Amino acid sequence: FDPVARVGGMNHFLLAEPPRHVRNQAFDSDYGLFLMELLVNEMLSLGAHKSRMRARLYGGANLNPDLKPIGTANAVFARQFLEREGIPKVFEDLEGVQARRIQFRPAGGQVRARLVPADSAPTQKPLGRPQSALGTVELF
């Protein structure tokens, strides 16, 4: 969020980086680094200045104890990204075992975050991966 330009954005990524065995075939658009760069660049194009940007981090929960700690890896990635880019982190609510519901008003930088009760979080796996819309054109 840039409070002077009143420009903000929010990202949600499921994996910080592709697993090693598929790195050469993975779409960059599915992973944290690409998505974070895209967000920062879009904010800059809307008048934000990197020197004024401030970040809040939410998420990184490890929802399934049977899987690798993906949420922890995402939290580590997000912290490192901000540090590398010189964007100060003003708040974080990361990790744990509960999902979060985030509401963000980008023009004013207001955030409301709530933990989602474990019994209301989705437990079923999605049926399939949607096709990436990157590089497609919709005519209307």
List each language-model region with its residue ranges.
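Short acidic-hydrophobic catalytic motif
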Residues: 2-54, 63-140
